[in-house]
């Protein structure tokens, strides 16, 4: 391929992206950043560059990050034994302190530092800042051996009760990129760990975001999980229940899709589940005709 051919290919890519850039300029896009894309340094940098490109063309990105693997690693390093009930971690006071340290003190700082190093204007927040996320202890009930429902205390695992998005709106309007850790405050003064997908979805609803992107370690929704070419590129909200009943949406994909459905019902324009392991996945999903993941819309 000659230098001219390479240049023409780049020009075609830019022209393909142009109508999408024009369409999304001035719009709010909430990005849930998690999975393998948080662990691989090269992918980290590519995600940050994608976010900065969105910001540079007038799109308003808001980032909400997870950090489960990093929390697990830190618990192991400090010798903190984890206790589980029905597969769910019990988050006691010490575990919550470690989770806050990792999410707010380490990961959030790393993300904003990387964005700023590449020329961005990123500001780190937790859900406790300006009472962005208010939570209560998440009630959990499980069926015991007698078939009766009983309450289970998982500690400082929270359920979002209220979102106060004013601080995020203010930062976005001033040209900053908010980066948010999923740690919420409660009226009892305690900190609560919030599922990052849920936190991102609730923030997207509160902002009435035009798009909500979930970076995952899967391509999206596959009609056949054994066939990577069976990706469902578009799913309507009213098709979700049927696909769950058919088993097309199953296992760990169900809570992500339910999160997508809740966001749509809360006024978000569209939700995208995409594979964050693919370099520049965000740009490929938003700025190309075919996209690379599954888009949910009303």
From Swiss-Prot:
Biological process (GO), any one: L-arginine biosynthetic process
Metabolic or biological pathway, per its Swiss-Prot or TrEMBL entry: Amino-acid biosynthesis; L-arginine biosynthesis; N(2)-acetyl-L-ornithine from L-glutamate: step 2/4
Subcellular localization: Cytoplasm
Major enzyme class: transferase
Alphabetical list of SUPFAM superfamilies matching this protein: Carbamate kinase-like
Transition state stabilizer (site feature) positions: 32, 256
InterPro entries: AceGlu_kinase-like_sf, AcgluKinase_fam, ArgB, Asp/Glu/Uridylate_kinase, Glu/AcGlu_kinase, NAGK-C
MF term (GO), any: acetylglutamate kinase activity
Keyword Kinase: yes
Reactions catalysed: N-acetyl-L-glutamate + ATP = N-acetyl-L-glutamyl 5-phosphate + ADP
EC number(s) on file: 2.7.2.8
Role, per record: Catalyzes the ATP-dependent phosphorylation of N-acetyl-L-glutamate.
Family affiliation: Belongs to the acetylglutamate kinase family. ArgB subfamily.
Protein name according to UniProt: Acetylglutamate kinase
Organism (species): Desulfitobacterium hafniense (strain Y51)
Taxonomic path: Bacteria, Bacillati, Bacillota, Clostridia, Eubacteriales
């Amino acid at each position: 391929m000659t230098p001219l051919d390479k240049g023409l290919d780049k020009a075609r890519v830019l022209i393909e992206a142009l109508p999408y850039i024009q369409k999304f300029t001035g719009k709010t896009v909430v990005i849930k950043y998690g999975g393998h894309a948080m662990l691989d340094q090269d992918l980290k940098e590519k995600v940050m560059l994608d976010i900065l490109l969105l910001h540079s063309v007038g799109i308003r990105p808001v980032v909400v990050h997870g950090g489960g693997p990093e929390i697990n690693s830190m618990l192991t390093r400090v010798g903190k034994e984890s206790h589980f009930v029905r597969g769910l971690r019990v988050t006691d006071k010490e575990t919550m302190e470690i989770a806050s340290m990792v999410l707010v003190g380490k990961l959030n700082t790393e993300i904003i530092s990387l964005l700023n190093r590449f020329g961005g204007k990123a500001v780190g927040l937790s859900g406790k800042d300006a009472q962005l996320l208010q939570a209560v202890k998440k009630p959990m009930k499980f069926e015991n051996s007698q078939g009766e429902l009983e309450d289970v205390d998982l500690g400082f695992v929270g359920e979002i009760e209220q979102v106060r998005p004013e601080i995020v709106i203010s930062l976005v309007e001033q040209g900053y990129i908010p980066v948010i850790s999923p740690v919420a405050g409660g009226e009892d003064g305690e900190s609560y760990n919030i599922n990052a997908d849920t936190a991102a979805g609730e923030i997207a609803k509160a902002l009435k975001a035009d798009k909500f992107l979930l970076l995952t370690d899967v391509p999206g929704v596959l009609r056949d999980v054994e066939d990577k070419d069976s990706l469902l590129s578009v799913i309507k909200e009213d098709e979700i229940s049927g696909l769950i009943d058919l088993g097309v949406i199953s296992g760990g994909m169900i809570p992500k899709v339910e999160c997508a459905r809740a966001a749509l019902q809360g006024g978000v324009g569209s939700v995208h589940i995409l594979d964050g392991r693919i370099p520049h996945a965000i740009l490929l999903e938003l700025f190309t005709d075919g996209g690379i993941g599954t888009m949910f819309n009303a």
